[in-house]
Amino acid sequence: MKGKLLSFTLFGESHGKAVGILIEGLPPGIEVKVEEMKAELERRKGIRRFSTKRRESDEPVIVSGVFNGFTTGTPVTVLVWNRDADSSYYEEIRNTPRPGHADYPAKVKFFGYNDYRGGGHFSGRLTVGVVIAGYFAKKLLERFGIRVRAYIRRIGPVECPQVEPEELFASPNPYCPDEDAFERMLEEMEKARKSGDSVGGTVEVVAINVPAGLGGPWDEDIEADLASALFRIPAVKGVEFGLGFRFAEMRGSEANDPFVVRNGRVATETNNHGGVLGGITTGMPLVARVAFKPTPSIYLPQRTVDLERMDEVELRLRGRFDSCIVPKALPVVEAMVAFVLADHLLRRKAWEGVVR
């Protein structure tokens, strides 16, 4: 993923030797603590009973770009070994693409040379690197008081009521600030698990203390950059900011956010636009929602095609699957938002150095 000043490249495959990330553009002097990085990676494992039975230790190995506990300003490379991959079953289904997965288009794209085991490079396993990128971005944002947090807004038909940013950031629950809604979400995930099926959901992400002035029109649009980043996450099928698609039902008099003065600075009375106008941050909390489709790998029979015989066949998957990926997606969504914000913040600071 390439920003103007920050970029990262993911490498590895789900069942390969390792996965990892190369991050370029990080300034020198960011303090790095491996235990903090590991804590972020632990969050990516989600709620155990609804996650894959694949158990990876996810020990990050910093290969370059960090010395004596601080970034050096040169490219950062971090490696995470794959220790618990089981590829045996994937040989049986290599010619029967799994519905909902990238198996078929990937085979076409790469002329059949792609690593099909566990989804290969298309696997959610690659988000290990995304979370690592997010760790570095969050450390940079911390210097300016910017914080990013995501929570589960919906699982299937169960929705968490809208929460204020203060309530979200004060909540001890790492998944959802509304305990009643969270219990009902757990029940919905359990129903899917027991039936051999899966369930989708929505993640809401909020960033606070974001200064006004990040972004710009057209190619500099921060919403466009955020949406592009969020859509790169496997299983994401929708992104909206502020009230999003609800704007289509409203009048301008309802939708507009009146400007007011709060504590000596310009703010808006409401935040329907999610902290962005004209592709530029307003100084209000940045709010986005991300829709995740249900995990495509399920234990129920599905129809597919045998690509060798060109026959329609029934596919019954065996393996280790998530019944819901939404809980483990929280640090991934945070990471993408933090990385885009960090890139735009560095751009803004460059301008400030010239103009001011």
Curated annotation (Swiss-Prot):
Function: This reaction introduces a second double bond into the aromatic ring system.
Swiss-Prot/TrEMBL catalytic activity: 5-O-(1-carboxyvinyl)-3-phosphoshikimate = chorismate + phosphate
Enzyme Commission number: 4.2.3.5
Keywords (A to Z) from UniProt: Amino-acid biosynthesis, Aromatic amino acid biosynthesis, FAD, Flavoprotein, FMN, Lyase, NADP
Cofactor binding note of this UniProt entry: Reduced FMN (FMNH(2)).
Name of encoding gene: aroC
Family that this chain belongs to: Belongs to the chorismate synthase family.
A biological process term (GO) from this entry: amino acid biosynthetic process
Protein name: Chorismate synthase
Residues at which NADP(+) binds: 44, 49
